[in-house]
């Protein structure tokens, strides 16, 4: 699993791509690796977020826009 940050779009879109096993898996793995999550993820506010708004850019992220942490 990879967590990262896109300087253009922020962390949410990259996490959406990496979240193949769902958000609970992302939160659990980030906690195990001691990686801080954005507040809306830590508070599980992602369940209330309009998914279409945040998914609109996920397919156009380029590697040059992302710094990845393993």
From Swiss-Prot:
Domain of life: Bacteria
Descriptive protein name: Putative uncharacterized protein RC0839
The organism's taxonomic lineage, starting at the top: Bacteria, Pseudomonadati, Pseudomonadota, Alphaproteobacteria, Rickettsiales
């Amino acid at each position: 699993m990879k967590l990262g940050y896109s300087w253009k779009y922020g962390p949410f879109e990259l996490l959406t791509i990496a979240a193949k096993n769902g958000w609970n898996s992302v939160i659990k793995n980030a906690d195990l690796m001691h990686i801080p999550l954005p507040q809306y993820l830590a508070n599980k506010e992602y369940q209330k977020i309009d998914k279409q708004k945040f998914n609109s850019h996920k397919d156009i992220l380029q590697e040059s826009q992302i710094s990845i942490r393993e």
